[in-house]
Regions:
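Short hydrophobic short-linear motifs embedded
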Residues: 10-13, 18, 26-28
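A conserved beta-strand-loop-helix scaffold within acyl/acetyltransferase catalytic domains
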Residues: 32-90, 119-139, 149-301, 316-330, ...
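Asp/Glu-centered strand-loop micro-motifs enriched in Gly/Pro and often flanked by an aromatic residue
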Residues: 91-100
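Short active-site oxyanion
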Residues: 113-117
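A cross-kingdom signal targeting lumenal/periplasmic-facing segments of multi-pass membrane
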Residues: 141-143
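A short acidic, glycine-rich active-site loop
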Residues: 306-316
C-alpha cells in the first residue's frame, strides 16, 4: 500500500482503531446506574488521570486539563471537559470515554438544557452530534498527523526543512530535551510582544504554558552557546494506558534570531520520538482550513465565514502561515469541527473568542 492510500485508510481513524486497542463498553444496566451518579467535577485528580490515560486519544485531551475547566463526570464511563461563558457551556475536544459510550455521555451532558457548543471535535463525534442531537457540525480546521514509521526528510516540499537544519548546524545551534529551564517565561514575554494578538496568551483552544498537571509532557530547547533561542512543549496523547503520540502545544522563539529554528527543533523532537518507537506525531490544529464542499450537516453560512476569515483575516491571526508551516512535514490532514445549535451562532462565536482571550 502506498503512503497516500495508507494515510487515507489508516490515519483518519481514531487512535484506538489505529493501535488496535480493544476496550469493552459498559453494559446497558451499568450505564443507567452510573448515569445516576454523574455530576460536575466529581472525579479526583487521580481518577481523571486514569480516564485520560485510557481514552485521551484526541490531540486536545491533555489540554483539557488546563486550569478553569469543568468536567461532566460519569463514573465507569469517562468525562466531558468544558468551560462556561455567558451562561453557555463550551466543550473542548471529544468526550474522554470509549467510542461506544459517546452518544450516552453526550446525551446525559445535554439534559440540563443549557446552551452548549462543541469546539475542536473529530469528524465521527461531529457526525454523531449532528445526527443524534440535531446540531450543525461545521468544519473549522484540520489536524495534521505524521506517520513517523515512514517519515523522512526526502522530497521537494521538505526542502525548507533540510535548509533550516543545515543553517542551524552552520550557526552552531544545538538542541536538547530538558525538564525545565528558568528562561521559559522571560522568552515567552518577549515573544508575546511580537504576536498579532499582543501581550496575552491564547487560552482554551491552546492550553496555557503553565499547568498544574504536566506529567508526561516533554520539553525541547534550542541554544546558541548559552543563549536560549526557543523551545517547544509536547503533550502526550494516550490510548489504553500507553503514550501513542505527542502534539506540540506550546512553542516560543527569540525575535533576535531571524533565521528561525522551529523546523530543526521539531525535526529533532520527531526523530527522538521515532527512535523511541513512537508511531505517530500529531501537529495540532490549523484553524480555518476547510474543504470547498459542504457536508449535509454543516452550516453553509458559517462555512463561508470561515473561508473568508482564512482568506482575509491573517492580520488578526496567521492562519495561512500556520498551515503552510505544518504542511512542510507532509502529514495527513484530518478534519476538525465545531458543533452549534444555531445556523448562524453569533453569540457562540463571540463567547469562544472571549474564552480564547482574543476579545
Amino acid at each position: 500500500m502506498n503512503t497516500s492510500a495508507q494515510a487515507t485508510t489508516v490515519l483518519d481513524l481514531p487512535v484506538r482503531q489505529i493501535t488496535g486497542a480493544k476496550i469493552l463498553p459498559l453494559p446497558l444496566r451499568g450505564r443507567i446506574r452510573e448515569a445516576h451518579n454523574a455530576g460536575i467535577d466529581k472525579f479526583s485528580l487521580d481518577e481523571r488521570i486514569s480516564y485520560l490515560r485510557r481514552y485521551g486519544d484526541h490531540c486536545m485531551s491533555f489540554s483539557a486539563m488546563q486550569p478553569g475547566m469543568h468536567y461532566f463526570d460519569v463514573p465507569g464511563i469517562g468525562y466531558i471537559a468544558y468551560k462556561m461563558q455567558w451562561g453557555s457551556k463550551f466543550v473542548l475536544a471529544d468526550p474522554v470515554c470509549d467510542e461506544k459510550d459517546r452518544e450516552f455521555i453526550i446525551s446525559e451532558f445535554l439534559k440540563d438544557g443549557k446552551g452548549t457548543a462543541f469546539a475542536q471535535i473529530s469528524e465521527p463525534v461531529a457526525e454523531l452530534i449532528a445526527e443524534k442531537f440535531g446540531y450543525y457540525s461545521t468544519q473549522f480546521g484540520v489536524e495534521t498527523i505524521v506517520d513517523l514509521e515512514d517519515w523522512n526528510l526526502k522530497g521537494k516540499k521538505k526542502q525548507v526543512l533540510r535548509t533550516s537544519i543545515n543553517k542551524a548546524q552552520k550557526d552552531g545551534i544545538h538542541f536538547i530535551e530538558k525538564d525545565h529551564v528558568n528562561g521559559d517565561r522571560k522568552l515567552t514575554d518577549e515573544w508575546l510582544k511580537t504576536r498579532k494578538v499582543r501581550n496575552r496568551e491564547i487560552l482554551f483552544l491552546i492550553r496555557p504554558m503553565d499547568m498544574d498537571y504536566e506529567e508526561g509532557t516533554r520539553r525541547f530547547y534550542a541554544y546558541k552557546g548559552d543563549e536560549l533561542l526557543g523551545f517547544i512543549y509536547f503533550d502526550p496523547i494516550y490510548s489504553d494506558n500507553k503514550v501513542v503520540s505527542y502534539v506540540p502545544n506550546i512553542s516560543r522563539f527569540s525575535h533576535n534570531f531571524k533565521q528561525g529554528i522551529f523546523y530543526p527543533l521539531m525535526v529533532y523532537a520527531m526523530e527522538t520520538f521515532k527512535s523511541e518507537g513512537l508511531r505517530y506525531m500529531h501537529l495540532g490544529l490549523s484553524p480555518m482550513v476547510v474543504d470547498d464542499k459542504d457536508l449535509y450537516y454543516e452550516s453553509s453560512i458559517v462555512k463561508k465565514m470561515i473561508r473568508l476569515l482564512y482568506k482575509y483575516g491573517n492580520m488578526v491571526y496567521s492562519f495561512k502561515g500556520l498551515h503552510f508551516t505544518k504542511s512542510r512535514f507532509q502529514g495527513t490532514d484530518c478534519k476538525t469541527f465545531c458543533a452549534h445549535k444555531e445556523k448562524l451562532p453569533i453569540k457562540s462565536f463571540l463567547s469562544m473568542f472571549k474564552l480564547a482571550n482574543i476579545l
